[in-house]
């Protein structure tokens, strides 16, 4: 049994993430960028104008759908999470400052991957028995590639449903509970017995909240995400900017460190001199992937519910999503850490302590501890919301609506388990299945890349183009 577990958490995890996901992400990003004429660069202004530029306009959705904004905030709910804070901190600690450069580079390329996922999701979506729009990799396989490719969609759903319990549930709940404990300990340290009881109470409360929202369907999830995601993101951005400009003299040198060590990490000297170029590249690329989820196909499930007639129009939200998640929030986390001048033990894994120490340079230790704890808590909560939808849709595709209701009940129960149990092995296995999701998704993306290119050409480049 131990050998099987080691295979899933070690060998298979390495193969899935390092030897399949990362190469496919870079090659796929380059390929789709070329096929679609680099619209993430040439049409970036148009994309921002027609996504973030419309956020404050009143939008209403038709039956069985959500507004385009609710769709993207639901996707961002699952995407903007602990990876933006802890993941970016780890990229710097394990890959050096130069890892931030590779994080940026990957984000620019994977914008076209997420654009393609969302575009295909709208193009090949369908109505379910309730009349709701459903889509995602399993549907663009089914309706775009045909019955002989059904196994690809089934594989995706199996991998995603399993991953939803770990990456999208237990690990996030554990992060919330840990954050709440940190916030409480900043004022009144709790005894071990009291902590266990508190964790159980927290777990039940979180499960109840998730249940109320989840059983309200996609419209309720979208309504909550639409309000929560912008608020938590803006607050985090504001406090990060306060720290960065509070150390304004370090902004230039911070960028200097990032670019100077992107190709020669040993240039920093000292503890960072032990970091190899491979580590810098791999950790930058890997944390970028963990942060924005481009290539996993998960966000396409949320976007499929958007009330829109244009696949490309919704696809532009995919570009915005990566920009907001990685280029904006991850960059601010990185600059907050580097500009603050906090000590970094290179080559060692870190949690939230780096960003907490950075905030403490401006706001003091107690406030920083509470703020980071609350930020992690909100980010983790919205991640659970997004993944509850993803897992539910995958189970629905495999077994039907009735069984998806059973999945939802099980998902809520697992929330409580994640709050009180230490299940590192389960999380590691789920992380492997998270990476495996990319394999069937990339098969479909490459096979249907011509469809995306055709839709993009019709929208942007034909004489009677749809883009105004």
Where are these regions (language model features)?
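Flexible loop linkers connecting adjacent transmembrane helices
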Residues: 38-66, 90-100, 112-146, 343-363, ...
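Alpha-helical membrane segments and immediately flanking helix-loop junctions
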Residues: 59-94, 120-138, 142-144, 155-161, ...
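Helix-loop-helix module between adjacent transmembrane segments
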Residues: 32-33, 106-131, 138, 142-174, ...
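N-terminal alpha-helical transmembrane segments of multi-pass membrane transport
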Residues: 1-82, 92-99, 110, 416, ...
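Transmembrane helix-loop junctions in multi-pass membrane proteins
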Residues: 4-5, 35-40, 83-88, 166-176, ...
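Membrane-interface loop-to-helix entry segments
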Residues: 24-31, 35, 39-48, 173-180, ...
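Extracellular/periplasmic helix-exit of transmembrane alpha-helices
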Residues: 115-125, 129, 239-257, 265-272, ...
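Transmembrane alpha-helical segments of multi-pass small-molecule transport proteins
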Residues: 22-27, 153-158, 184-218, 234-236, ...
């Amino acid at each position: 049994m131990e050998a099987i577990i080691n295979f899933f958490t070690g060998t298979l995890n390495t193969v899935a993430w390092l030897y399949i996901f990362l190469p496919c992400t870079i090659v796929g990003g380059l390929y789709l960028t070329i096929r679609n004429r680099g619209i993430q660069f040439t049409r970036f202004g148009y994309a921002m104008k027609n996504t973030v530029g419309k956020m404050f306009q009143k939008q209403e959705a038709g039956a069985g759908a959500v507004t385009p904004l609710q769709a993207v905030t639901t996707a961002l709910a699952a995407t903007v999470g602990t990876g933006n804070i802890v993941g970016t901190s780890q990229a710097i600690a394990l890959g050096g400052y130069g890892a931030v450069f590779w994080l940026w580079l990957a984000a620019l390329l994977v914008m076209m991957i997420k654009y393609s996922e969302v575009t295909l999701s709208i193009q090949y979506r369908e109505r379910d028995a309730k009349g709701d729009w459903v889509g995602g990799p399993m549907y663009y396989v089914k309706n775009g590639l045909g019955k002989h490719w059904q196994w690809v969609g089934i594989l995706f759903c199996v991998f995603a449903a399993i991953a939803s319990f770990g990456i999208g549930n237990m690990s996030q709940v554990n992060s919330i509970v840990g954050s709440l404990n940190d916030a409480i300990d900043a004022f009144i340290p709790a005894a071990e017995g009291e902590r266990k009881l508190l964790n159980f109470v927290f777990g039940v409360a979180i499960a109840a909240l998730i249940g109320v929202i989840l059983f309200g369907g996609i419209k309720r999830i979208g309504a909550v995400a639409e309000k929560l995601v912008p608020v938590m993101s803006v607050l985090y951005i504001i406090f990060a900017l306060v720290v960065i400009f509070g150390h304004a003299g370090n902004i230039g040198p911070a960028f200097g460190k990032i670019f100077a060590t992107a190709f020669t990490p040993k240039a920093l000297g000292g503890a960072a001199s032990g970091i190899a170029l491979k580590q810098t590249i791999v950790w930058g690329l890997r944390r970028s992937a963990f942060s924005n989820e481009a290539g996993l196909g998960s966000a396409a499930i949320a976007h499929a519910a958007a009330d829109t007639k244009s696949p490309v129009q919704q696809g532009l939200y995919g570009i915005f999503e990566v920009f907001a998640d990685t280029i904006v929030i991850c960059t601010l986390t990185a600059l907050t850490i580097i500009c603050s001048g906090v000590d970094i033990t290179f080559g060692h894994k870190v949690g939230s302590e780096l960003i907490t120490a950075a905030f403490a340079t401006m706001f003091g230790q107690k406030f920083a501890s509470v703020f980071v704890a609350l930020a992690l808590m909100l980010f983790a909560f919205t991640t659970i919301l997004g993944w509850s939808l993803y897992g539910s849709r995958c189970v629905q595709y495999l077994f039907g609506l009735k069984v998806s209701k059973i999945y939802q009940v099980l998902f809520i129960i697992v929330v409580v388990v994640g709050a009180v149990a230490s299940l590192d092995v389960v999380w590691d296995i789920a992380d492997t299945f998270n990476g495996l999701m990319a394999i069937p998704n990339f098969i479909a993306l490459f096979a249907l890349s011509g469809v995306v290119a055709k839709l993009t050409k019709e929208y942007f480049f034909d004489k009677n183009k749809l883009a105004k």
